[in-house]
């Protein structure tokens, strides 16, 4: 359960804050001012699902200013900053994956262009490690997860 003491059984991988790395990656991204909704396993974990968290899947709000913030934040967080596309390119891509010291962040950019209003409307801000993270509703997170997993098979 979110916020409980870490243990080997609860999926926190012994993290001292009690959060999986993917959840912490989303929290760090949230502190940068990037507007996004957390989806995928990290969102489901925060919603109380017993699910392993592999990474942070974030749907980025479309718009030039947010793309500029996203590019700057990802470049600051990335293990290889030169690999982060410029903001104008980000606005055209479907998915960008960035490796950080907190783990992998998948930026679902196309999903933001298609579903931002609905995802944002159904999402809630949840406290994570001292900051607020916009977290998708469980139904939305499950729907995106099943759609994305089906496409990747």
Enumerate the predicted regions with their spans.
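Compositionally biased terminal segments of proteins
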Residues: 1-153
């Amino acid at each position: 359960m979110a916020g409980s003491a870490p243990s080997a059984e609860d999926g926190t991988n012994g993290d001292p804050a009690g959060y999986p790395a993917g959840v912490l990656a989303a929290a760090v991204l949230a502190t940068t001012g990037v507007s996004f909704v957390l989806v995928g396993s990290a969102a489901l974990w925060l919603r109380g699902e017993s699910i392993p968290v592999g990474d942070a899947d974030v749907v980025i709000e479309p718009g030039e200013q947010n793309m500029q913030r996203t590019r700057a934040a990802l470049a600051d967080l990335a293990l290889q900053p030169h690999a982060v596309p410029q903001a104008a390119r980000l606005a055209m891509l479907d998915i960008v994956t960035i490796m950080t010291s907190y783990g992998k962040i998948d930026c679902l950019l196309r999903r933001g262009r298609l579903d931002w209003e609905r995802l944002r409307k159904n999402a809630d801000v949840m406290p994570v490690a001292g900051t607020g993270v916009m977290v998708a509703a469980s139904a939305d997170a499950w729907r995106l997860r099943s759609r994305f997993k089906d496409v990747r098979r």
